């Protein structure tokens, strides 16, 4: 019996010993490693589970349900997932759902943590440039899937949606910028009771109504998946109005952010909303945001964090934090470190409010100058970024590698383990290279640090920080280090294989005792990988109890006491570092403990923004005092302080600060002196004798700020600058002799000021500062050549044409290139005439395409060749060997060269792609045996208007205007005998902003002109882009109410009685166009009523407000005019006679008021305003004589901003409102006002509305109707020409186009269409009706079976067939603000009047002072010739001092639209005939 008892006790002891040994092991358990053949591309845990998904680069999806111990390949129900998973995405708000996307249209979803997968089909490749999946923050069953189809740089995003986890899928809509849910995050609008209203709302970035270019994109929304209204409703982003140029949207916690950018500027506007209804533009404390130059950082529940790039060259930024509604941002810290991908060294410590780690650049000035590398230092904030301090380890400053040097997946420094922070870094003055650093750890949330292990390591936290592991991150390793006491002591465990570690991870909440380590067996990290699962469960024998925890304060103040943030202190119950236990609460996140604090000043924010001293708040709008108060200006009343408690702040009000209580305010604060109904005048007497040129630096609609900047060059070559439209002037470069000014045509804040030497100055901040620069050579001495050329995309890429060898007797022009900011000038080509970048958004692979005219054999006696190159002339191709000139107009490159068979005659050739040229085919009814001159007119409607000189007799110049097809090669006659002058300018002008409207003057007595009889001109107008023309209908009465001297037929012009207008060829200031791109439908002109155009002395001033359908006489005599506030103000001043009054109209010319601006009469030389005609300020350029001064140069600023009290209110949904009505242009020749397959509708302010437009861009309300197709929507196909009856017939001798070519080019094409002789014009949007281009379809070879299935053109096909060409062509009349520098116009190719010798002989002065490609119509309208000649290339340079006008005067008046015009030149009487401005290459800037 005793023996049995001893045996029993022995067994029990052995069992207990065995059990104790099992309870505590000496090292973690490492499961047998799993080998996989391919590199992992992504890995994630389903939250609060041990289930892991891993995607490999070969398309396999692996699943583990035991935290990585074992893995299996997911094949799907039918094996279709194997090798077909392109990428995986976890649902961010539902831990049961994930998505596997395939490359071939088949995708999969799981709703049970990858136990089962259901497939769904969307025949789209997942989007790469946009989010492929967009998740709903409130309903996890709602997901948007996005695929994209791209053609060159243009992409169409197709967004599909599901409301039932992809059991059903429907098309949401096509867009250009993708779609997103309004509720993009669970916190969005959660406290606003909007759940029902916005639960189905989605936003999409869609193309402009007329142009699919980024600057025209719109943000629309729908609450019913675009079912009820396919177009959706435009989002009112700014002051209740839509905004064009929206690039993208993003959901950031409780905010939605939209970014918009206008053409002509890199500046972005960020708009923010917290309720998906009310949006505000974010302000950044004076900083500007640029595209690809800001990063949305991890933000709090109550503010946004944004890092703004301030130094593109060196990668530094400024960190900003917003107020609670995201509208006003305060600067936190400067010189933050960024990389070229926009990643910022910034991380919030997980789980603890207010602690932020950032890296900054210690030596920003040296880095910016390029003389030193970055010296990076680390800083930490414990008060939400208000203040920063160094990290400390053993009394030294510590610096850590951060996001820009990310070496692992997940967060960089922290995890949900309370207070545990790790990083790779070093102590000293600044951060060293990664390999020279060590692993540091902090267990007090970054207050103090200690070195944990030498050398860099990958690391991870587990069991709420009770376990920390680290794997050395250099070379091959075969062990894992771990610590159980917050990194004080370390142990290690061996691995079976030596690996190059790529990932170290655990559950997202860091509560597990299990870790996964992934490594490659090869240093290249390709091919075979090993997965280790490490389990620490057996290292402690017990679970922590209450005494093992401490109440740990998450934040401490400067005195080491718990600190308050957002009205409370934060604590955690945290395991003590030396506790011999594990927390072992798997998947249970540590819970913070909050203790409320009394309110302090830090718990309040300004409703708008702080005052400059930071002590108070700016009130955003004038205060309204209580009724009965403010009987006197000096009275006081109780009003708001401007402060508010930060939403979500939990501070205790009793006994605390109360900054939001009402304060005593002066009644002066409640007045608004700027809206007192008065016009204000500011006179400035300038020291200069006169002005030679002036240039407006127009702000684009996405630009911040409100300055109205003008750079004026005086007759003494001194520079004057004003930022307030002439109210004050300054001389920033006093003593410097500036001879030329160039405005950057693609960046409206940039200007270059040149001298006659190598020295120059430039500004990139709108003339606030000027920096010197050194050119590679003095400017070319050929004053008709432009010195600078600019790249449309790479804004810092420049071409300089300089004078070389001028002291040796062989003075010629060489071209140099600067490839980017900070780069040196490099030689490009010698003996050149003109060099230009030919990169265009619509021209594939053209980024480096450059055209140059070069003299053959590098001799000025040689023929002029046209060369092209894609590698900056390391290699080049000769396009033409005997070119007269070339120019770019919209998408066309048009070249004038000598006919080989007849050198005295010219030939025009055209290219769209910049590679292949086709000879222009003139219509049979335009017979000009010797073609000596062309003028290429504006081409904004995807067709070239070309004036061909038929008579060049001095004083008798005229010729037909012909219009091309969409590739610029085949022409039809538009109108005959159009007037031109001896300089090549043509009386042709398109009405800006209106499709298809143009005005010309024709010679009515052609037969008599050949007999030296003076020309008799008649004015005609077209409303359908040149297809039909009519005489202008005259008004019934003149300005005095009297009848005209001819019989007026109401509403109709007759041969004996019609209105005739003085056109471009007669203008004193060629920039004064009839129309304005922002004042849609308005035109003003000087002319007369009769049977032909009379002399200037008989001229009166006329206006139309319906696009030229009807006209009204405004004033007797000749007046100059300007439009303001998009046409709601019109100011006129007498031309060529002294005055002290102006006349103005506030109702589109219906009534006129007189205003006296001066006590004495002055002579007005010019009147100007901002090029977009959106300002309320006008500037009179005058000469003043009074008792104090005699004949003094002066400017008068006339400010109308006080005339009206408020901005107009617009309801986009209703169209008509109290302030606006919907206006539809009339096209009298077209049925239902249809042109290009649609009718348009515009918002126009009611003339009676007492408010301001305050709109930087005119806005198309809608394409009112898409019309049915007619013959007018088709043109003749290639190799076909129009016949007398309007039909298209094959050109004799030419073959039919090979329709089957499409099958050869694209093997996937199923069918082709037999040619019919017609093709749809690119800009039409017509639907249905006449179908002339598709009669007979046939199957492609070997596609007969597929052909049997009916195929219609796809959505994207329709898009690119109908809409994309508009990107190239643009709709007529893009608003002033986005057209540039003489970019529209006439390109004159050819002769000079009055020469007796052969026009094209070598000795002809025309070749010596050669010939022009003249560009004319400014913006989409006017006939401002762009004379592109070998003597003049839009030179901003030559200054004519005699008339006070220089050649290069972009932005000088309404005629000089900022983004629509640039180098506008006056004609100097004694100069040779060929003048020019930059080629018209920006015509695509059409309205949204």
Swiss-Prot record:
SMART domains to which the protein is assigned, alphabetical: VPS10
GO CC terms: cytosol; Golgi apparatus; late endosome; membrane
Topological domain spans for side Cytoplasmic: 1373-1405
BP GO terms, sorted: Golgi to endosome transport; Golgi to vacuole transport; protein targeting to vacuole; vacuolar transport
Topological relation to the membrane, as annotated: Multi-pass membrane protein
Glycosylation sites noted in the Swiss-Prot or TrEMBL record: 301, 325, 481, 845, 967, 1266
Keywords: Glycoprotein, Golgi apparatus, Membrane, Protein transport, Receptor, Repeat, Signal, Transmembrane, Transmembrane helix, Transport
Function statement: Functions as a sorting receptor in the Golgi compartment required for the intracellular sorting and delivery of soluble vacuolar proteins, like carboxypeptidase Y (CPY) and proteinase A. Executes multiple rounds of sorting by cycling between the late Golgi and a prevacuolar endosome-like compartment.
Family: Belongs to the VPS10-related sortilin family.
Domain notes: The lumenal domain contains two regions of approximately 650 AA that exhibit 20% identity. The cytoplasmic domain may serve as a Golgi retention/recycling signal.
Name this protein carries in UniProt: Vacuolar protein sorting/targeting protein 10
Organism: Aspergillus oryzae (strain ATCC 42149 / RIB 40) (Yellow koji mold)
Native organism taxonomy: Eukaryota, Fungi, Dikarya, Ascomycota, Pezizomycotina
Gene transcribed to yield this protein: vps10
């Amino acid at each position: 019996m005793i023996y049995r008892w001893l045996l029993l006790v022995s067994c029990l002891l052995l069992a207990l010993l065995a059990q104790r040994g099992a309870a505590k092991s000496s090292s973690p358990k490492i499961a047998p490693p799993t080998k996989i053949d391919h590199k992992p591309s992504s890995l994630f845990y389903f939250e609060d589970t041990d289930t892991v998904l891993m995607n490999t680069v070969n398309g396999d999806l692996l699943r583990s349900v035991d935290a990585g111990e074992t893995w299996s390949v997911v094949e799907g129900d039918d094996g279709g997932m194997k090798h077909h998973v392109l990428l995986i995405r976890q649902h961010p708000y539902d831990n049961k759902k994930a998505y596997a996307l395939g490359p071939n249209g088949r995708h999969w979803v799981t709703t049970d943590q990858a136990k089962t997968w259901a497939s769904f089909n969307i025949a789209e490749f997942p989007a790469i440039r946009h989010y492929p999946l967009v998740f709903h923050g409130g309903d996890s069953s709602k997901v948007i899937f996005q695929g994209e189809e791209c053609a060159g740089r243009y992409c169409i995003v197709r967004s599909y949606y599901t409301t039932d986890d992809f059991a059903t899928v429907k098309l949401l809509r096509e867009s250009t910028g993708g779609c997103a849910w309004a509720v993009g995050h669970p916190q969005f609008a959660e406290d606003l009771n909007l759940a029902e209203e916005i639960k189905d709302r989605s936003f999409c970035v869609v193309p402009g109504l007329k142009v699919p270019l980024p600057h025209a994109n719109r943000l629309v929304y729908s609450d019913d998946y675009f079912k009820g209204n396919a177009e959706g409703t435009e989002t009112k982003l700014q002051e209740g109005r839509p905004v064009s140029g929206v690039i993208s949207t993003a959901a950031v916690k409780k905010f939605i952010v939209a970014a918009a950018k206008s053409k002509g500027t890199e500046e972005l506007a960020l708009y923010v909303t917290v309720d998906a209804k009310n949006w505000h533009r974010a302000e950044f404390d004076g900083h500007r945001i640029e595209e690809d130059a800001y990063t949305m950082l991890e933000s709090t529940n109550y503010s946004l964090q944004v890092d703004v790039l301030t130094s593109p060259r060196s990668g530094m930024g400024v960190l900003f934090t917003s107020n609670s509604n995201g509208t006003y941002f305060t600067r936190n810290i400067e010189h933050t470190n960024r990389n070229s991908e926009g990643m910022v060294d910034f991380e919030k410590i997980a789980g603890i409010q207010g602690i932020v780690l950032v890296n900054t650049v210690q030596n920003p000035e040296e880095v910016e100058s390029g003389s030193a590398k970055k010296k990076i230092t680390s800083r930490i904030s414990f008060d939400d970024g208000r203040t920063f301090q160094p990290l400390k380890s053993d009394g030294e400053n510590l610096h850590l590698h951060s996001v820009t040097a990310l070496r692992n997946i997940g967060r960089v420094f922290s995890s949900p383990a309370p207070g545990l922070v790790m990083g790779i870094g070093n102590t000293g003055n600044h951060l060293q290279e990664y390999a020279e650093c060590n692993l540091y750890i902090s267990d007090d949330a970054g207050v103090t640090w200690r070195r944990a292990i030498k050398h860099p390591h990958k690391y991870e936290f587990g069991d709420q920080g009770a376990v920390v592991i680290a794997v050395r991150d250099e070379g091959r390793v075969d062990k894992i280090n771990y610590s159980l006491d917050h990194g004080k002591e370390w142990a290690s465990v061996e691995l079976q294989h030596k690996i190059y570690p790529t990932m170290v991870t655990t559950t997202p909440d860091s509560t597990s005792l299990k870790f996964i380590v992934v490594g490659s067996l090869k240093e290249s990290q390709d091919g075979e990988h090993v997965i280790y699962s490490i389990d620490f469960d057996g290292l402690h024998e017990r679970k922590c109890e209450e005494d093992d925890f401490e109440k740990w304060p998450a934040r401490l103040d400067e005195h080491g006491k718990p600190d308050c943030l957002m009205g409370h202190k934060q604590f955690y119950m945290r395991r003590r570092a030396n506790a011999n236990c594990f927390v072992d609460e798997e998947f249970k996140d540590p819970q913070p403990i909050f203790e409320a604090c009394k309110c302090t000043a830090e718990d309040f924010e300004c409703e708008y923004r702080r005052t400059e001293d930071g002590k108070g708040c700016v009130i955003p709008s004038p205060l309204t005092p209580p009724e009965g108060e403010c009987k006197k200006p000096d009275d006081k009343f109780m009003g708001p302080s401007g402060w508010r408690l930060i939403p979500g702040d939990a501070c205790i009000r009793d006994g605390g600060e109360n900054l939001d209580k009402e304060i005593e305010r002066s009644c002066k604060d409640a007045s608004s002196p700027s809206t007192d109904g008065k016009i204000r005048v500011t006179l400035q007497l300038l020291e200069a004798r006169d002005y030679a040129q002036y240039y407006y630096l127009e702000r684009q609609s996405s630009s911040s700020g409100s300055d109205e900047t003008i750079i004026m060059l005086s007759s003494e070559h001194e520079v004057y600058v004003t930022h307030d439209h002439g109210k004050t002037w300054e001389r920033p470069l006093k003593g410097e002799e500036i001879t030329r000014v160039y405005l950057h045509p693609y960046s409206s804040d940039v200007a270059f000021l040149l001298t006659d030497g190598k020295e120059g100055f430039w500004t990139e901040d709108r003339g606030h500062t000027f920096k010197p620069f050194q050119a590679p050579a003095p400017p070319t001495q050929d004053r008709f050549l432009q010195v600078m050329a600019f790249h449309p995309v790479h804004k810092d890429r420049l071409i300089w044409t300089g004078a070389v060898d001028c002291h040796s007797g062989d003075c010629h022009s060489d071209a140099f290139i600067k490839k980017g900011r900070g780069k040196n000038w490099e030689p490009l080509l010698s003996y050149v005439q003109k060099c230009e970048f030919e990169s265009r958004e619509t021209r594939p692979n053209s980024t480096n395409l450059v055209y140059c005219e070069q003299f053959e054999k590098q001799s000025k006696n040689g023929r002029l060749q046209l060369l092209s190159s894609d590698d900056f002339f390391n290699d080049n191709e000769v396009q033409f060997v005997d070119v007269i000139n070339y120019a770019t107009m919209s998408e066309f490159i048009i070249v004038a060269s000598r006919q080989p068979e007849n050198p005295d005659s010219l030939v025009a050739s055209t290219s769209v792609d910049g590679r292949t040229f086709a000879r222009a085919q003139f219509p049979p009814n335009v017979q000009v045996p010797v073609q000596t001159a062309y003028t290429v007119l504006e081409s904004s409607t995807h067709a070239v208007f070309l004036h061909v000189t038929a008579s060049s007799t001095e004083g008798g110049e005229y010729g037909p205007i012909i219009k091309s097809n969409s590739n610029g090669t085949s022409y039809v006659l538009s109108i005959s005998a159009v007037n031109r002058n001896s300089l090549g300018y043509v009386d042709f002008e398109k009405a800006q902003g209106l499709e298809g409207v143009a005005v010309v003057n024709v010679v009515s007595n052609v037969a008599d002109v050949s007999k030296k009889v003076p020309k008799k001109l008649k004015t005609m107008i077209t409303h359908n882009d040149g297809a039909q023309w009519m005489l202008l209908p005259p008004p019934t009465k003149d300005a005095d109410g009297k009848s005209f001297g001819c019989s007026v037929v109401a509403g109709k012009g007759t041969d004996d009685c019609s209105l005739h207008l003085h056109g471009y060829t007669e203008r004193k200031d060629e920039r004064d166009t009839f129309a304005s791109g922002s004042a849609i439908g308005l035109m003003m002109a000087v002319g007369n009523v009769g049977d032909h155009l009379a002399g200037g002395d008989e001229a009166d001033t006329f206006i139309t407000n319906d696009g030229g359908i009807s006209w009204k006489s405004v004033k007797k005599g000749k007046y100059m005019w300007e439009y303001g506030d998009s046409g709601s103000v019109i100011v006129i001043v007498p031309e060529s006679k002294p005055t002290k009054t102006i006349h103005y109209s506030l109702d589109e010319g219906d009534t006129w008021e007189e205003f006296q601006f001066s006590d004495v009469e002055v002579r007005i030389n010019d009147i100007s305003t901002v090029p977009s005609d959106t300002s309320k300020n006008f500037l009179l350029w005058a000469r003043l004589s009074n008792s104090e001064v005699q004949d003094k140069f002066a400017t008068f600023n006339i400010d109308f901003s006080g005339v009206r009290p408020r901005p107009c209110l617009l309801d986009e949904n209703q169209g008509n409102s109290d302030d606006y009505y919907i206006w539809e242009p009339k096209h009298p020749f077209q049925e239902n006002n249809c042109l290009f397959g649609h009718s348009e509708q515009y918002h126009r302010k009611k003339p009676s509305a007492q408010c301001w437009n305050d709109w930087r861009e005119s806005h198309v309300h809608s394409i009112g109707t898409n019309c049915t197709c007619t013959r007018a929507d088709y043109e003749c196909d290639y190799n076909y020409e129009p016949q007398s009856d309007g039909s298209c017939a094959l050109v004799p001798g030419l073959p039919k186009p090979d329709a089957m070519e499409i099958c050869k080019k694209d093997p996937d094409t199923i069918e082709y269409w037999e040619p019919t002789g017609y093709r749809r014009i690119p800009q039409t949007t017509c639907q249905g009706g006449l179908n002339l281009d598709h009669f007979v379809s046939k199957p492609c070879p070997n596609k007969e079976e597929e052909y049997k299935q009916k195929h219609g053109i796809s959505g994207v096909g329709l898009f690119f067939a109908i809409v994309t060409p508009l990107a190239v062509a643009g709709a007529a009349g893009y608003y002033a603000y986005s057209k540039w520098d003489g970019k529209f116009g006439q390109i004159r190719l050819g002769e000079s009047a009055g020469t007796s010798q052969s026009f094209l002989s070598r000795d002809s002065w025309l070749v010596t002072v050669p010939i022009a490609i003249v560009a004319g119509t400014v913006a989409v309208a006017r006939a401002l010739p762009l004379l592109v000649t070998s003597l003049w290339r839009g030179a901003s340079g030559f200054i004519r001092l005699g008339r006070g006008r220089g050649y290069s005067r972009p932005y000088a008046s309404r005629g000089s639209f900022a983004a629509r015009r640039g180098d506008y030149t006056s004609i100097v009487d004694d100069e040779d005939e060929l003048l020019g401005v930059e080629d018209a290459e920006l015509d695509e800037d059409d309205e949204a």
